[in-house]
Swiss-Prot record:
Keywords: Heme, Iron, Metal-binding, Oxygen transport, Signal, Transport. The keyword Ion transport does not apply. This is Globin CTT-VIIB-7. GO terms for cellular component: extracellular region; hemoglobin complex. It comes from the Eukaryota.
Length: 162
């Protein structure tokens, strides 16, 4: 039991300002508008930042147009988007903080092993937000909720890159 109390304190410290229920609802609602556009989301990231595409051995050095409609691309895009869907679905509930922390920490650890830099995490964020702005109902409240969510996510993931 003591372990879980310590873990909970670590999570709260790492995610000092978790999303409110209202912010989580805004993020979930906007994500629901695009979460089935997996291929388009990943293609937008690769188009904006070819250096990210170069980190994927199965896609490195290939023309985006030639890989976008392949099963391998769709499968990988679905993995990425499904990760976000899982984290978003857990957001807004204090009881889920340790689960969110574990998922996002693992994301950072896994990407550190692949040589992904903090700058590339930043590029991914920029491309994702640009995609969201163009494809969902976007206003100041949506921007604020997404920034809060991504700030929390990146604080944990980037700590794992250290």
């Amino acid at each position: 039991m003591k372990f879980f109390a310590v873990l909970a304190l670590c999570v709260v410290g790492a995610i000092a300002s978790p999303l409110s229920a209202d912010e989580a609802a805004i993020v979930k609602s906007s994500w629901d508008q695009v979460k089935h556009n997996e291929v388009d989301i990943l293609a937008a990231v690769f188009a904006a930042y070819p250096d990210i595409q170069a980190k994927f051995p199965q896609f490195a050095g290939k023309d985006l147009a030639s890989i976008k409609d392949t099963a391998a691309f769709a499968t990988h895009a679905t993995r990425i988007v499904s990760f976000f869907t899982e984290v978003i679905s857990l957001s807004g509930n204090q009881a889920n903080l340790s689960a969110v922390y574990a998922l996002v920490s693992k994301l950072g650890v896994d990407h550190k092993a692949r040589g992904i830099s903090a700058a590339q995490f930043g590029e991914f964020r920029t491309a994702l937000v640009s995609y969201l702005q163009a494809h969902v109902s976007w206003g100041d409240n949506v921007a604020a909720a997404w920034n809060h969510a991504l700030d929390n996510t990146y604080a944990v993931a980037l700590k794992s890159l250290e």
